[in-house]
Amino acid sequence: MGGRLPFNQSFWEEFLMGREGSLPNLPEISHVSKRVVRILGGNPGSMHLQGTNTYLVGTGRSRILIDTAQGLPAWIHRISSFLFTHNIELSYVLLTHWHGDHTGGVPDLIAHNPLLTNKIYKNNPDAGQNTITDGQIFSVNGATVRAVFTPGHSVDHMCFVLEEENALFTGDNVLGHGFSVAQDLGCYMDSLRNMSALACGLGYPAHGAIIENLPGKLDEYIQHREGRERMMLSTLTKELVQGQERRGEGTKGGLTLNEIVISIYGRLPQEVIEKALAPSLLQVLWKLTEDRRVGFKPGDPLKRQWFALISVE
């Protein structure tokens, strides 16, 4: 074993959930409902699961396309062939957010059909694109799609309600397997709750299999994030109490991120802490700071000390 640090099994089960192993195979093209066709982006991997899901929505010749994958030749070949074979034209191309695995296919799509240049929609549009606003409606035969602003995973993230199916295109906010990541955890939690309030039964995620029980999946996501907050706040509160016992009342104490990780997960390789855990745990700490439940001492984010401002039961 040498000087190697032991791996924490519970951490790896969480971190690798839905990543590369034991994922169900998804067809390259599939009719997932009578009005929704899923076309995979051809970009499978640890961050993209089976690849980016792009969706053709509608029942007539005119359809809505949601997302354009990463820009790999496999995707433009699949979708262009499908459009030609089924005599379909695109009325709207809706982008859930700016990340490259969702917008990368736009140039290929326009190169294939220059008439689509003015049919690209995004919340924070690039030059020549159209904006998407909260509540905006996009309609074609057989499909009414309503945009819902859901920031957090990214600043411009949109979900889309398919009214005819009471279904939600969840983008990257909720995945078919495992958990997503957030740029702004506070906004992300608000968006998850707003998505839950829509009461859609079915989820069409941007990565992974269809979510048959979307309310249950949203509850799982919310509880997972809230559980992490409670766990970290409890760890810091315990340190606060023990620090006051050791050094007297009024002592803030505090733990570095490494010390928090060791307390919660046990000892892990430093590379794992910095590359896998630190980004998400720092987001939790920042949210707790914004909620005025945690404070910190100035310094490097990985080395500064964090301390509880209030106690928990």
UniProtKB/Swiss-Prot annotation:
EC number: 3.1.-.-
Associated pathway: Secondary metabolite biosynthesis
Cited InterPro entries: LACTB2-like_MBL-fold, Metallo-B-lactamas, RibonucZ/Hydroxyglut_hydro, Sec-metab_biosynth-thioest, WH-like_DNA-bd_sf
Record-level Gene Ontology MF annotations: hydrolase activity; metal ion binding
Entry keyword set: Hydrolase, Metal-binding, Zinc
Active site: D101
Record field: transmembrane: none
Cofactor(s) essential for the protein: Zn(2+)
GO biological process: secondary metabolite biosynthetic process
Cofactor binding comment, as recorded: Binds 2 Zn(2+) ions per subunit.
Keyword Zinc: yes
Residues binding Zn(2+) 1, per UniProt: H97, H99
Residues the entry annotates as binding Zn(2+) 2: D101, H102
EC class name: hydrolase
Homology family: Belongs to the metallo-beta-lactamase superfamily.
PANTHER family for this protein: ENDORIBONUCLEASE LACTB2, LACTAMASE-LIKE PROTEIN APTB-RELATED
The protein's name in its UniProt record: Lactamase-like protein nscB
Native organism: Arthroderma gypseum (strain ATCC MYA-4604 / CBS 118893) (Microsporum gypseum)
Highest classification ranks of the organism: Eukaryota, Fungi, Dikarya, Ascomycota, Pezizomycotina
